[in-house]
């Protein structure tokens, strides 16, 4: 039980600290990459949706 509670605490702690990344800005030398960086968190969702499209193409065997 203690392991589960500590795991939940670690997840919440990492979530709180990771949310500060959303307001972080890239250095000026990499400012031209801003549009790409904005789209990057959505890329794993495309793979998730691709799995459903693939299964639909093979009739959910």
From Swiss-Prot:
Q: Which residues form the propeptide?
A: 1-24
Supply one GO BP term: photosynthesis
* CC terms in the record's Gene Ontology section: chloroplast thylakoid membrane; photosystem II reaction center
Q: Give a yes or no for keyword Chaperone in this entry.
A: no
Membrane topology field: Single-pass membrane protein
Record's keyword terms, sorted: Chloroplast, Membrane, Photosynthesis, Photosystem II, Plastid, Reaction center, Thylakoid, Transmembrane, Transmembrane helix
Q: Which residues cross the membrane?
A: 40-60
Subcellular location(s) per record: Plastid, Chloroplast thylakoid membrane
What role does it play?
One of the components of the core complex of photosystem II (PSII). PSII is a light-driven water:plastoquinone oxidoreductase that uses light energy to abstract electrons from H(2)O, generating O(2) and a proton gradient subsequently used for ATP formation. It consists of a core antenna complex that captures photons, and an electron transfer chain that converts photonic excitation into a charge separation.
Assembly behavior: PSII is composed of 1 copy each of membrane proteins PsbA, PsbB, PsbC, PsbD, PsbE, PsbF, PsbH, PsbI, PsbJ, PsbK, PsbL, PsbM, PsbT, PsbX, PsbY, PsbZ, Psb30/Ycf12, at least 3 peripheral proteins of the oxygen-evolving complex and a large number of cofactors. It forms dimeric complexes.
Identify its protein family: Belongs to the PsbK family.
**Protein name per its UniProtKB record:** Photosystem II reaction center protein K
**What organism does the record attribute this protein to?**
Cucumis sativus
In the UniProt record, the gene name given for this protein reads: psbK
């Amino acid at each position: 039980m203690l392991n589960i509670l500590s795991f939940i605490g670690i997840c919440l702690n990492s979530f709180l600290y990771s949310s500060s990344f959303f307001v972080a800005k890239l250095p000026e030398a990499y400012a031209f990459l801003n549009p790409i960086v904005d789209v990057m968190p959505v890329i794993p969702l495309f793979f998730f949706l691709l799995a459903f499209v693939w299964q639909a193409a093979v009739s959910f065997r």
